Amino acid sequence: MQGGAFRNIIIFLLLAVLAFVAGSLASDGAQVALLPVVLVLGSFFLLYLGRNCWWLIFMVPPVFALADLSVLNSFPISFVICGIVLVYWLLMYIMGYVKVTWNGFAPLDVLNFILLTYFLSTWIANPVTLQIFTSITDEGYADVGGKEYFWAIGCVVAYLALSLIPISLESLIKVLKWTFIVSCIMAVIMCAKGLVLGGGYSTELAETTRYSPFYGVGSVSFDYLFAKFPVMGIVLSPWKLVLVLGSCMAIAMTGFRENILEVVVYAYSLSFIHRQLIILLCGCVAVWGFLVYLSNEKMLDGLPYGAQRVLTAVPGVEIENKEITGGAEHSLEWRFEMWRWAMTPSEGYIKDYVWGDGFGQSMYQLRLTTISMNRGKMSMGDQRFFAETGVWHSGVITAIHRTGFVGLTIIVVWSLVCFFYIFRVSIALRHVKGREFIYLSIFPFVTLMVLFYISAGTFRKLFDDIFYTAALAKVVCSVVAKNGLMPRMFTHQIYVPLIHREAEDEESAASPARS
């Protein structure tokens, strides 16, 4: 038996045994004991893949994103995987097994460097430490916290891992295709798990509360259909249209209005790429008119609770359930009140509006907050608690608080440039086979960034999801440019009248070919 085949059999058997042990621990709820097993399992799988170890960067995060693994979900899985793969790749490079390159794209590289450098300057201006290393000083307690700085370090590791490993366009599409398949499998598994644990589909729960077992399946289906097919292709196909409508209902049943906003932004973005934006706009107007008609006829009361809550954000649509409308209005007023506090200097929640207060928090203030909670004067759901801890439920306000207007300006410019190149590279890939899998991987940047600005945006989301997707988009731009598919941004062409061009063509055709 050849050595390579024997090695593959041994590693496969070890992976099977470890997978069985991991499944047993997960079913018993022993998530803490599951961590070392997962690490050993991942190490063997890393050795098995060899030069293809970079596949794990794309294929592992969807598993942890959809699976409910308690303790493991609190870890920055994507950054950990990137760090492990980067170290392993560099070791193979030192031993001469692989090569190292730089998947560079100057505009995005420069802006990413500026963004991360500004976060570093924020830490220098507002240093923080870990709580276990703090001590009482004459001026009070030290500033602690700043998890966002560790997330920024993770971003650098992920950025280097994606940039240093040679990746071709064909291999990238292949890996992203398998990543999508893994996401579909995990979505179906989690949907089945939610239904089994809940005793099947519960009409009572769907009519009285937010219902989310179908969200993963609906989201994956909707994203793929709009990435693969143009709007007219969906409308003219009955099964595609039914699948899109069913996906929208599954997403709406969660009751989160930002989920529907994410769907709308994603659909409009892909329709722009497919050059059918006007068709989608007309379709949305028709759907809006139909919803207004149903509202006037009092025919929306039979919809699930979550769907009715989502429709409270649609102009012209009236929901009869006062509990739903009252809760939605209270949610908006609750946020607006906190944002008013944040932008009022006399409230004292933000000290430096220009450069920001950094990501730390005074231990003295944390101590006061803890005492207030213990005495029953404050709870974790109070506005004052969120304001004291810097949780503003708005990416814009959070950016101003932590990095100031200067940091917010840098983030806005960075996001706009990323928007531009994501759309540009997507248009360049419009006729490439398998392009939909690239769309599925880079267009979440557009939707997540929009939600960061107008919804509960946090810097953890910015680092963990948004910056990671921006790094992947940069790699896609680099790979596409190396393949000569990226059109030049500025070209200088001298205008030549048509009559002269025809004369030149005739002369060149009549002249003998040069040897």
Predicted regions and their residues:
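Membrane-interface helix-loop-helix junctions at transmembrane boundaries of multi-pass membrane enzymes
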Residues: 49-51, 93-111, 229-242, 275-278, ...
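Alpha-helical transmembrane segments of multi-pass inner-membrane proteins
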Residues: 7, 40-45, 153-165, 170-199, ...
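N-terminal hydrophobic segments of proteins, predominantly signal-anchor/transmembrane helices
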Residues: 45-149, 153, 233-236, 445-451
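Hydrophobic, aromatic-rich transmembrane alpha-helices
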Residues: 36-48, 84-98, 220-233, 406-429
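Helix-loop-helix junctions and helix-breaking kinks within/between transmembrane helices
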Residues: 21-33, 50, 70-81, 212-215, ...
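Long extracytoplasmic/lumenal interhelical loops at the membrane interface
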Residues: 197, 201, 329-333, 337-403, ...
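A membrane-periplasm/extracellular boundary helix in multi-pass inner-membrane enzymes
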Residues: 249, 253-254, 274-326, 347-348
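Loop-to-helix entry and N-terminal half of a specific, functionally important transmembrane alpha helix
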Residues: 390-394, 401-402, 414-455
